[in-house]
Amino acid sequence: MATGDDIPTFKLVLVGDGGTGKTTFVKRHLTGDPEKKYVATLGVEVHPLIFHTNRGQIRFNVWDTAGQEKFGGLRDGYYIQGQCAIIMFDVTARVTYKNVPNWHRDLARVCENIPIVLCGNFVDVKDRKVKAKTITFHRKKNLQYYDISAKSNYNFEKPSLWLVRKLLGDPNLEFVAMPALAPPEVQMDPTMVAQYEQEIAAAANAELPDDDEDL
């Protein structure tokens, strides 16, 4: 854990296929320092995001690939000293979920046992292809999973809160002020939200498949 301005600071590695909403996820947060840094050697943007908790302020330096993943795998320098990670996929594109194990493998190889959240983005889109019952990778690898929607801010604070609790070893830690987010561009249908949450709860109790048919 690095400290800058006496604020506990963690390197958060954000990975996933191109077009899954990683940059949008970062830019929806208005808590970031506009002085983002660009690491030209790695083709990476580093966005500082500050969260206010009952344990004081916490800063994530979020490493965003700036589209580099479209040209093949990321360099190890992107992952080195990563202390936590978010793997993002698009629930409307099955191939982005099928590639999750590849991103996890690279993270595990370089960063070993860091807390990781898997996020299925674009759950505001009605034509969902990757259903809750088929999302089992996180259970096999002991990751946390959340449905999220970048455009509606649905569940947006949950990945960050879960990671902070893990990093500080405090399951009771809370945000004292909700993260400042850009206004939602779309509204989630409450009926759809209730259905998805019910499906995720049911999937959490279902038996895991023996093989990787879910991928």
Curated annotation (Swiss-Prot):
Mg(2+) interacts primarily with the phosphate groups of the bound guanine nucleotide. Pfam families: Ras. Its cofactor is Mg(2+). GO terms for cellular component: cytosol; nuclear envelope. PROSITE patterns: RAN. Residues 36-44 are annotated as: Switch-I. Residues 67-83 are annotated as: Switch-II. GTP binds at residues 17-24, 35-41, 67, 121-124, 149-151. One of its GO terms (molecular function) is GTPase activity. Keywords: Cytoplasm, GTP-binding, Magnesium, Metal-binding, Nucleotide-binding, Nucleus, Protein transport, Transport. The record marks 68 as: Essential for GTP hydrolysis. Its main location: nucleus. One of its GO terms (biological process) is protein import into nucleus. Residues 210-215 are annotated as: Interaction with RANBP1. InterPro entries: P-loop_NTPase, Ran_GTPase, Small_GTP-bd, Small_GTPase. Residues 6-170 form the Small GTPase Ran-type domain. It is found in: Nucleus; Nucleus envelope; Cytoplasm, Cytosol; Cytoplasm. GTPase involved in nucleocytoplasmic transport, participating both to the import and the export from the nucleus of proteins and RNAs. Switches between a cytoplasmic GDP- and a nuclear GTP-bound state by nucleotide exchange and GTP hydrolysis. Nuclear import receptors such as importin beta bind their substrates only in the absence of GTP-bound RAN and release them upon direct interaction with GTP-bound RAN, while export receptors behave in the opposite way. This is GTP-binding nuclear protein Ran. It comes from Onchocerca volvulus. The lineage of its organism: Eukaryota, Metazoa, Ecdysozoa, Nematoda, Chromadorea.
